[in-house]
A protein has these predicted regions:
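Amphipathic alpha-helical segments enriched in hydrophobic/aromatic and basic residues
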Residues: 1-7, 64, 68
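Hydrophobic alpha-helical connector segments
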Residues: 2, 8, 14-50, 97-104, ...
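Residue-level marker of structural boundaries
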Residues: 5, 9, 13, 17, ...
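Short amphipathic alpha-helical interaction/hinge segments
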Residues: 7-15, 45, 61, 79, ...
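Short linear capping/connector segments at secondary-structure termini
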Residues: 14-19, 51-55, 68, 118-123
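Amphipathic alpha-helical packing segments from all-alpha helical-bundle domains
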Residues: 28, 39-48, 52-54, 62-88, ...
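C-terminal peripheral helix-coil segments that are non-catalytic and often amphipathic
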Residues: 28, 32, 36, 73, ...
Length: 146
């Protein structure tokens, strides 16, 4: 539990403060949040924690529940605030926020899982995290249709 708090959960107060003082658009905020997440968690040894928790959730449900309360719930709340800010400001169309939050964080979970598993042994299919995040934000904001 201490490892989860020290390496991931303790970042949410600062991220929430950054949300409160962010001056840019909601699109810029979304891009910043996803990039910041990669910089502060995904690109560090802490990125292995979610893989371990998910892989062992059945054997250690107390840790999985702790992780959910300390990391997943605050993460979803922050993503929801970003998306709601965009809707309220007329920048994003009205969407189902309950599902939309998953479309934001699921690719980040994939990226972290890839980095700590298949990314270690598949030289021909390496994923550039920064380019992946840029593309993900672009698809989230603009879709793929012309």
């Amino acid at each position: 539990k201490a490892v989860i708090r020290e390496n991931i959960a303790n970042l949410f107060p600062a991220w929430n403060e950054e949300f409160n003082t962010f001056k840019g658009s909601s699109s810029e905020m979304l891009r910043y949040a996803m990039g910041s997440w990669w910089e502060r968690i995904g690109n560090t040894p802490a990125s292995g924690i979610p893989k371990l928790v998910m892989g062992e959730a059945q054997n250690f449900p107390e840790i999985a529940n702790f992780y959910h309360a300390e990391v997943i719930e605050p993460g979803i709340a922050l993503i929801r605030r970003i998306l709601q800010r965009g809707i309220d400001g007329g920048e994003f169309r009205k969407i189902d926020l309950d599902q939309a939050v998953h479309t934001v964080y699921a690719p980040m979970i994939f990226l972290m899982m890839w980095k700590n598993s298949m990314g270690l042994c598949t030289a021909g299919t390496q994923i550039n995290p920064e380019r992946f995040i840029d593309m993900q934000v672009d698809v989230l904001l603009h879709g793929m249709t012309l």
